[in-house]
Amino acid sequence: MSVVEIEDGVYESTAVIDNGSFGTRTIRFETGRLAQQAAGAVVAYLDDETMLLSATSASKSPKDHFDFFPLTIDVEERMYAAGRIPGSFFRREGRPSTDAILTCRLIDRPLRPTFVSGLRNEIQVVVTVMSLDPKDLYDVVAINAASASTQIAGLPFSGPVGGVRVALIDGTWVAFPTVEQLERAVFDMVVAGRKTADDVAIMMVEAEATDKVVELVAGGAQAPTEAVVAEGLEAAKPFIKVLCEAQQELAGRAAKPTADYPLFPEYGEDVYYAVASVATDALSEALTIAGKEERNNRTDEIKVEVLGRLADQFAGREKEIGGAFRSLTKKLVRQRILTDHFRIDGRGVTDIRALSAEVAIVPRAHGSALFERGETQILGVTTLDMVKMAQQIDSLGPETSKRYMHHYNFPPYSTGETGRVGSPKRREIGHGALAERALMPVLPSVEEFPYAIRQVSEALSSNGSTSMGSVCASTLSLLNAGVPLKAPVAGIAMGLVSDDVEVDGKTERRFVTLTDILGAEDAFGDMDFKCAGTKDFVTALQLDTKLDGIPSQVLAGALAQAKDARITILEVMAEAIDAPDEMSPYAPRITTIKVPVDKIGEVIGPKGKMINSITEETGASISIEDDGTVFVGASNGEAAQAAIDKINAIANPQLPKIGERFLGTVVKTTDFGAFVSLLPGRDGLVHISKLGRGKRIAKVEDVAKVGDKLRVEIADIDNRGKISLVLVAEEEAAEASDNGSATPSDKAPATADATTAGN
């Protein structure tokens, strides 16, 4: 592996990923040819067919009034990458797809902590997908491309960052798996990290069990238990190392010198010393208050007092006083956890807050549930509908439709604040996607449960891990809606605090893992680790850390601790509901039938005439798939059965015979007679000469109008299948009725009589 100058000023480095019997993948980085005015630009290739351009730029002057690092990541999906024209009205790309937004988050999470602290210049990384092999996923390539372009941009960046997707296929962890290979995987995860002196520091993990995991495990595949997931993280490290080395070699030849950027530390040492001297005692006491609101009110009071006491001494440096106060709060919270193993709300490190689960909360919803964990409160609401209501996806990913949709809402009142409401922000999209992935492996197939499912999670109150609360509320709500889940799923958020502690005159690194973290513990801790799963295996996992790597034994311990908490939560959820409820009376009843593929056109009819007619007459909704699967949905079973009977009459017809009698509906009149509907798609003609019951009539409309019911008998069927009808004598019709002959529903166009000619 080395850098090659392929032409003047154009450099290339290569990383070869060896998957053993699964083959090799080649990731190539090139710079110097495209986007030359960007601070750093790299084109990343995956096996030559997939091509992404990443360009990193920085503003010339800092935004010193910001109290955060203004990093922006954008992913641009170009439809020409797949040889397609966008399906929008204007035929050009518009707002980013969900896949693009989730990829932005995958890039941001490992890159952001890699920049020097205090940087306030605006940094923008734009990744453009220019070519995509349909067998590949571009998200992990984008992580490496973004890191490589930033590494050569002359920024204070301590990268590079390597990103890899590894999937557990036939007991082997395979890097950069193809879409086809993922069909055989039981677990799939994206891992990003940095190369250290003797190891790889894991910075970010996004993982999930596949939707085939239950079937594959039942067939003998290895279940993705906590131990297996930990092995997968270790398996990802050599691949990340190779990717980081390729980026480092490219930067060694092509990187700009690191420029001097002004840094704006949160506070000066003199400010921190002053704040600590006046606030430590009062703040330490306030941080033992268990209730969030009461604790926050008290710490706010102390902050105001500190600002008042130090305002004259540090005039014009009020922002630094606020930063120092926050840093002191962080130090005290962490100190108590590390030394006393007690947290700010008084819990031990493995304690879970009070749990509550309840179903059937929203009256007319198809399914609903309320899940509470301490001050975190999530309302889950399930809606069922026809499969045709599945979300259609127009993106570069392999997924074209989505039957299960999970939408997460985080209104400002959930934290007692005001703010914008409306379209979801990136965080809400990311949290919804995480909860969706957690539940996908346990959802029934469309054959088992022919419904589109929309799950909405409303974060009504937030103090720690609303995303994992959404997983729990969704499981409860889905069961309440009657969805036959393969297993219930629960989630928990874990945290980590670490520091060097003096023990018997020696300094040792101490790690303390926290179960069920609060919002403050998330902000002040070293790791945010969300884990969801059943009682038997992990279904989804998300990890972000601020440390340069977490020891394997610490991570394995956190996974085991998370499982213990998950089992406890599942037991509480089972008390509320442990099996699917009866479906709501307000939910549609959907039945599936099969028709021959060559009969689909007849069921639909010219310009949809036949299917629209059935829908209007029965009130049922009908959806037909290309393979002949027909989904019939209705508010009651009778309407659904009526629609099914009509569809079967067309697709699997029993041809009427001479002598059969029907109560038919006049559907058309002409100068020569009246057409009467006998069965769906099967009409017969009563000639004008047969309409007068032996009397001559001048106009058909004098005796038969469209919509009239006529008792008719089949007199003849010619060799072309045309049916000639005659009216049944009134006395015969009355006699048949008195003898109990079947009288069809007025809604039905026709139904065969029980009597036939000769009876």
UniProtKB/Swiss-Prot annotation:
Q: Name one Pfam family in it.
A: KH_1
> PROSITE patterns of this UniProt entry?
KH_TYPE_1, S1
Q: Any idea which UniProt keywords this protein has?
A: Cytoplasm, Magnesium, Metal-binding, Nucleotidyltransferase, RNA-binding, Transferase
| Low complexity: compositionally biased ranges | 741-759
Q: Where in the cell is it found?
A: Cytoplasm
Protein residues bound to Mg(2+): D522, D528
Q: Name the Gene Ontology molecular function terms of this record.
A: 3'-5'-RNA exonuclease activity; magnesium ion binding; polyribonucleotide nucleotidyltransferase activity; RNA binding
Q: Which InterPro entries match?
A: ExoRNase_PH_dom1, ExoRNase_PH_dom2, ExoRNase_PH_dom2_sf, GPSI/PNP, KH_dom, KH_dom_type_1, KH_dom_type_1_sf, NA-bd_OB-fold
Biological process GO annotation list?
mRNA catabolic process; RNA processing
UniProt domain S1 motif: residue ranges: 659-728
Which coarse location class applies to the principal site listed for this UniProt protein?
Answer: cytoplasm
Q: Does the keyword Nucleotidyltransferase apply?
A: yes
GO cellular component terms, alphabetically, are: cytosol
**Cofactor(s) for this UniProt protein:** Mg(2+)
> Which chemical reaction does it catalyze?
RNA(n+1) + phosphate = RNA(n) + a ribonucleoside 5'-diphosphate
Q: What is its EC number?
A: 2.7.7.8
Q: Which PANTHER family match?
A: POLYRIBONUCLEOTIDE NUCLEOTIDYLTRANSFERASE, POLYRIBONUCLEOTIDE NUCLEOTIDYLTRANSFERASE 1, MITOCHONDRIAL
The record describes the protein's role as: Involved in mRNA degradation. Catalyzes the phosphorolysis of single-stranded polyribonucleotides processively in the 3'- to 5'-direction.
Protein name in UniProt: Polyribonucleotide nucleotidyltransferase
Q: Which source organism?
A: Mycobacterium sp. (strain KMS)
Q: What is the lineage of its organism?
A: Bacteria, Bacillati, Actinomycetota, Actinomycetes, Mycobacteriales
